[in-house]
Amino acid sequence: MIKDSSVQVEGQEKVCLDQWVAHYRAYAAKGRSASYIPALGEINVSQLGICIVKPDGTMIKSGDWEIPFTLQSISKVIGFIAACLSRGISYVLERVDVEPTGDAFNSIIRLEIHKPGKPFNPMINAGAITIASLLPGTSVQEKLESLYVLIEKMIEKRPAINEIVFQSEWETAHRNRALAYYLKENGFLESDVEETLEVYLKQCSIEINTEDIALIGLILAHDGYHPIRKEQVLPKEVARLTKALMLTCGMYNASGKFAAFIGLPAKSGVSGGIMTLVPSKSRKDLSFQDGCGIGIYGPAIDEYGNSLPGIMLLEHIAKEWDLSIF
């Protein structure tokens, strides 16, 4: 039975979240939608929502938390985990490195300058496209199935693809096609270019909400252990490596600034989603500091492709509740 004091604290947390979401929603006007993907350009950019999941399963939600959106680059985390589970970490890292890059997420310049063209990390497009070719299976559907199974294992519901967004991405994926063909030429793609690209763009088009990504964040926060179900659902080594990559490479070429001023492992997507997590801290003045997952949605993005009001909201929360890992 939950004590009255716990209920009171959680009520205060909800009041704070509601106030902060209302405040930072106004900053959405300074951002823009990812209009280079036509379907995303039609989204209402004034939306802002958040879901926080604690280890005991308690959820605190505010704003437009239930609005469905596509994973976009957040799917790179899922793809990396799935590839590591099926191929092993060593095999995956022979084809994709773990180094940060200050370039844009869809840049091709590093592949050309640094021989033999190995992608710098799995959180940029070149790395994620390579990872898509490493997923288990011999067909597009079989490779996607490995992602569906993994996601369902973590959030206990089967995801679906937003076909409108996928078609919009497929028709405008000129840069990604260039990346894929360059990777194929250099021997990093293990499957057909067009099939690999279809897998990648469909994984980006998987539809979820803030609760879903908060649950995934919670599991990663606890090194692959699901504290609600009391079950190890991911190998600890894979979860820890994934968190390290999220911290160093997860917020595009704003990852360094994000680590310095917010200090949490996170992965964003141009749809406006941010999946972040708070590892358990030695000092636990607040329940959040015992390890939690956070999902944010705010489709007004900044020049880096990150949710502008979402980052502002998260920075405020991290400071107010002392969530930084540093």
From Swiss-Prot:
GO terms for biological process: glutamate biosynthetic process; glutamine catabolic process. It catalyses: L-glutamine + H2O = L-glutamate + NH4(+). Gene3D superfamilies: 1.10.1500.10, DD-peptidase/beta-lactamase superfamily. It holds the Pfam family Glutaminase. One of its GO terms (molecular function) is glutaminase activity. InterPro entries: Beta-lactam/transpept-like, Glutaminase. It comes from the Bacteria. Keywords: Hydrolase. Coiled coil: none annotated. Its EC number is 3.5.1.2. Substrate binds at residues 73, 125, 169, 176, 200, 252, 270. HAMAP family: Glutaminase. Homotetramer. Belongs to the glutaminase family. This is Glutaminase 2. It comes from Bacillus cereus (strain ATCC 14579 / DSM 31 / CCUG 7414 / JCM 2152 / NBRC 15305 / NCIMB 9373 / NCTC 2599 / NRRL B-3711). The gene is glsA2.
